[in-house]
Amino acid sequence: MVLKSYAKINLSLSINRKLSNGLHEIQSIYCLVDLYDSITIKKNKKEVIDDISFTGTHSKHISKLNNSVRKSLNLLRKNGLITDYYSVRINKKIPVFAGFGGGSSNAVSLINYLTKNKINKNFFDKMNNELGSDLRLFYHNRGFLKNLKTIKKINKSYNLYFLLAYPSIKCSTKEVYSKVKKYTKKQDYLNKNFKKKDDFINYLKNCKNDLQSIVEKKYPKIKNLLKDISDRKGCYFSRMTGSGSACYGVFSNENSSKAALKKLRKKYP
């Protein structure tokens, strides 16, 4: 069986406060994009062990012993949801340490497949506590993360054209969040009434990623890349996703995004 494990991007990301456990409460409008890892999975009938390997451009920085796939399989067995062991091959097309959530997406894709999309709230909470709080994002193609435990699905869909850029910088999520000093007041996205795509785009233009200025300060290359993207014809706005370092631009149409990509590839070979 081959699974597609999609990347996410944060269309907005606001840091609301720091919790007593050291985590930060955030809000985010997000969506999944057409960038994915391919996961090939089959039962390992010869050995009582999981055989996990990663291939592809972005595989070399992933630990074979300490990764989201292995942790997911162990958690499923620990909770009696599976008993078998598996051979899993992941072709990594999603950059790591980039803000795309590739590891979390891999975990959710695997868990959904092995449980046939049937998990109870108790396991769902364990999964998010032990594997990562952003796993819940991958249960909707798009949504509004209201707080660390609540996601509101966005039912209305718009055709958005993205240019994705990875500047080959590995950002530490822990380090980036440790430098947060200012907080943004909570908002309720669902109170907004967007009658058409332009209204939604204009709203997003006025949003931001609170972590972006922190990362730009350490890596000026990211600030320059974002400006290069936003200066391209047809670009509504550019932004960093998650805690970086990946950036994106939202374009008015596919041709504009492809033309921008062609020019950026010449500047950033």
Language-model regions, residue ranges each:
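ATP-binding N-lobe of GHMP and related small-molecule kinases
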Residues: 1-98, 116-122, 166-169
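Short hydrophobic/aromatic beta-strand micro-patches
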Residues: 248-250
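Conserved, helical-rich catalytic subdomain that frames metal- and/or nucleotide-binding sites
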Residues: 50-54, 138-237, 252-265
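Short secondary-structure junctions
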Residues: 79-84, 231-235, 266-269
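Phosphate-handling active-site elements
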Residues: 78-87, 113-131, 253-264
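DPxDG-like acidic metal-binding loop motif
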Residues: 98-124, 137
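Glycine-rich beta-strand-to-loop/alpha-helix junction loops that act as flexible
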Residues: 100-103, 240-245
